Every structure is written in structure tokens, then in C-alpha cells.
């Protein structure tokens, strides 16, 4: 059975294996053991209540409960940009016009922005390619909404998610090549690694401070503004179906879109509810996949089950109860996995 649980110190080698499969561009999952160990330690201290809000971040893993294999990772940053500035570009417009010459030009322009400072962030979503089946991607991504719904007071009103932009298998980013490299004088992979290992001071020191007309970029770079890596397209679709939208903010490195949503308008958060759980044999039928989570902050768990999402009393097997660390009579959080579909 696939289970979402909080990260543990012993997961570092498994996270290294996952990091080696990302193909680059996933800044928050570098293949660097020391950095990953620090990230795990920060998550543990967050759960223990030892960090200020500006440093808090939760990390979860997707585990096969039978074999102990870690198949994926996802995370939530509680409030971005309160320690180090959180940069992106806002894609706006500057108008240059002359009535005398009968000239009017509305030019797409990139403005450096810190507009999302203080927002909660969905980040570090990666599922091992071998496990991209049977709803695992949905479980991994949407499990975070169950945690946010259960512990709403720990998060801010706006949630953002940076989507990986267009990068090829060799680490080539058209957006970086045309813009970032001119100011940072390094390859995308180097900048990505420095950022992922916490060495972010160079961003504020070197990045352009003035608006940039996109027409000055290569056509290839212009074409990828706000576009996602092909492997990231499913993750974008998942978030958009939950209510997230692209509001013309992009990543400063690869030009990928930043999606955002008010936390209380996220479908899975808004529609999740608490039901009593009982042990037994679940009813057979053509039921949709649903997310089920316990309400245990320190031992949080999420699994997928097929059940009636409108039920008031959820019947689970002994194995499912054990995976959720629940007992008969406990209350669990339930929501349909996909509002638009009967099956995952």
C-alpha cells in the first residue's frame, strides 16, 4: 500500500536516489547529501515547533508500506521570502506611444517582483518514473492539501507553486541562455545547483534590477515564458483542476510559470471533511478514488481508497487502518481525489 508520511532522517539515501533521477531543474531537490540532510533536519524541527515561521518547511515522502521503498517526495514551505528575498518576474506591459507619429506599441515586459513574499509554497514534487502509475502522482501532490486542511492555522492565505520550466535533457534552458546567463555568467546547471544548496546571495547581487523587454530575448526564450517542462505538464494540470491559476508570474531562472490560489479556495481543502472510521470489509462497487488522512500532526498519514465520498462512516480494512495509524472510532479527513472523474 502506498502511504504518505513525514520525512525521517533515515530517508536521506532514498532522497539522493530520487534527486539523481530529476534530470535537473528541480532546484529544491539537489543531488547533494549534505543539503538534503539539512532539509530533513529543518522539516523535523518544524514539526517539533523549534523554528520561526520564516524557516518552517514540511517534507513528506511516498512510501510502499510493504517494502519500505521511497517512491516520491513533496513539500510545503510555510512562508517564503521572509529570510531570503523570493524573486520572480511579473510579465506585464509597457506602452510606448506617440500621437504625432501615429505610433502605439504595447511591449511585453519582465518586472522583478517580490509580490509572493509570505505566501505558503508547494514545492519539491517528484515521483520516481517507475512509480508513475495507479494514482501515485495524484496522491503525492494532493496529500499536501489534506495536511493544510487539517492544520490550516499553520499556513498563510495564499498558496503558490513554481512549475519547472522548459529545459532539455542536457540542462539547456532557452530562457536562461537568453537572459540569466548574460547577468550571472554561468551555466543554468551551476546557478540551479547554487540556489538548491542554499547559496542564494548571488541572485540579489547579480540579477537585473530594471524592467526587461521580452522582444530583446531570443524567439526561443520568448516562446517558453510561462511554459512548463513536458514532464511537469501533468502536475500543472492537477493544480489547475484544484483551482490554481497562472497570474503572469514566472521563475527568474527557467521562465516556468508560478501558479497561485487562495488557500480556502483549493478544492481538496474546501471540500474535505471529517468522518468516523470503522474496521470492516469495505463495500464493493464502482466507487471513485478518495484521499483519506489522519489528523495526527506528528504522525500524519494519507492513503488512497475507493469509497463513497459522501459517506458519514468510512469502512476501512485492518491494513488500511494500520497504514493510517488509526483505530475504529477515530475521525479521518476524506475528500474525493478528482472532482471531475469517477476514477483516478
Swiss-Prot record:
One GO MF term: arginine N-succinyltransferase activity
Enzyme Commission code(s) on record: 2.3.1.109
Pathway noted in the entry: Amino-acid degradation; L-arginine degradation via AST pathway; L-glutamate and succinate from L-arginine: step 1/5
Active-site residues from the entry: 229
Any Pfam family: AstA
A GO biological-process term: arginine catabolic process to succinate
UniProt KW Acyltransferase keyword: yes
Binding-site residues for succinyl-CoA, renumbered to this chain: 125
Alphabetized SUPFAM superfamilies for the sequence: Acyl-CoA N-acyltransferases (Nat) (SSF55729)
Broad enzyme group: transferase
Sorted UniProt keywords: Acyltransferase, Arginine metabolism, Transferase
InterPro entries named among the record's database cross-references: Acyl_CoA_acyltransferase (IPR016181), Arg_succinylTrfase_AstA/AruG (IPR007041), Arginine_N-succinylTrfase (IPR017650)
Catalytic reactions on record: succinyl-CoA + L-arginine = N(2)-succinyl-L-arginine + CoA + H(+)
Family: Belongs to the arginine N-succinyltransferase family.
Function of the molecule: Catalyzes the transfer of succinyl-CoA to arginine to produce N(2)-succinylarginine.
Classification via NCBIfam families: arg_catab_AOST, arg_catab_AstA, PRK10456.1
Protein name (Swiss-Prot/TrEMBL): Arginine N-succinyltransferase
Organism, as annotated: Escherichia coli O127:H6 (strain E2348/69 / EPEC)
Amino acid at each position: 500500500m502506498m502511504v504518505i508520511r513525514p520525512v525521517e532522517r533515515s530517508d536521506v539515501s532514498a532522497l539522493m536516489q530520487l534527486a539523481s533521477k530529476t534530470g535537473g531543474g528541480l532546484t529544491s531537490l539537489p543531488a547533494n547529501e549534505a543539503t538534503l540532510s539539512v532539509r530533513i533536519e529543518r522539516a523535523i524541527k518544524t514539526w517539533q515547533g523549534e523554528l520561526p515561521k520564516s524557516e518552517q518547511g514540511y517534507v513528506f515522502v511516498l512510501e510502499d508500506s510493504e517494502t519500505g521503498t521511497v517512491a516520491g517526495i513533496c513539500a510545503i514551505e510555510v512562508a517564503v521570502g521572509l529570510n531570503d528575498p523570493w524573486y520572480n518576474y511579473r510579465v506585464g506591459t509597457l506602452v510606448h506611444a506617440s500621437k504625432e507619429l501615429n505610433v502605439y506599441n504595447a511591449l511585453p515586459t519582465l518586472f522583478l517582483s517580490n509580490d509572493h513574499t509570505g505566501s505558503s509554497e508547494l514545492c519539491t514534487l517528484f515521483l520516481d518514473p517507475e512509480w508513475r502509475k495507479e494514482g501515485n502522482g495524484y496522491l503525492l501532490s494532493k496529500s499536501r492539501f489534506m495536511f493544510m486542511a487539517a492544520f490550516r492555522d499553520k499556513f498563510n492565505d495564499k498558496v503558490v507553486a513554481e512549475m519547472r520550466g522548459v529545459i532539455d535533457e542536457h540542462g539547456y534552458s532557452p530562457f536562461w541562455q537568453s537572459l540569466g546567463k548574460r547577468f550571472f555568467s554561468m551555466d543554468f546547471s551551476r546557478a540551479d545547483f547554487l540556489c538548491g544548496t542554499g547559496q542564494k546571495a548571488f541572485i540579489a547581487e547579480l540579477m537585473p534590477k530594471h524592467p526587461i523587454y521580452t522582444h530583446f530575448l531570443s524567439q526561443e526564450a520568448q516562446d517558453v515564458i510561462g511554459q512548463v517542462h513536458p514532464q511537469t505538464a501533468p502536475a500543472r494540470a492537477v493544480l489547475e483542476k484544484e483551482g490554481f491559476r497562472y497570474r503572469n508570474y514566472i521563475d527568474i531562472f527557467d521562465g516556468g510559470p508560478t501558479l497561485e490560489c487562495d488557500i480556502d479556495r483549493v478544492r481538496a481543502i474546501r471540500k474535505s471533511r471529517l468522518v468516523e472510521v470503522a474496521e470492516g470489509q469495505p463495500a464493493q462497487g464502482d466507487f471513485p478514488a478518495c484521499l483519506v488522512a489522519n489528523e495526527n500532526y506528528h504522525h500524519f498519514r494519507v492513503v488512497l481508497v475507493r469509497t463513497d465520498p459522501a459517506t458519514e462512516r468510512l469502512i476501512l480494512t485492518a491494513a488500511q487502518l494500520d497504514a493510517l495509524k488509526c483505530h475504529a472510532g477515530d475521525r479521518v479527513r476524506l475528500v474525493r481525489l478528482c472532482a471531475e472523474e469517477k476514477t483516478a
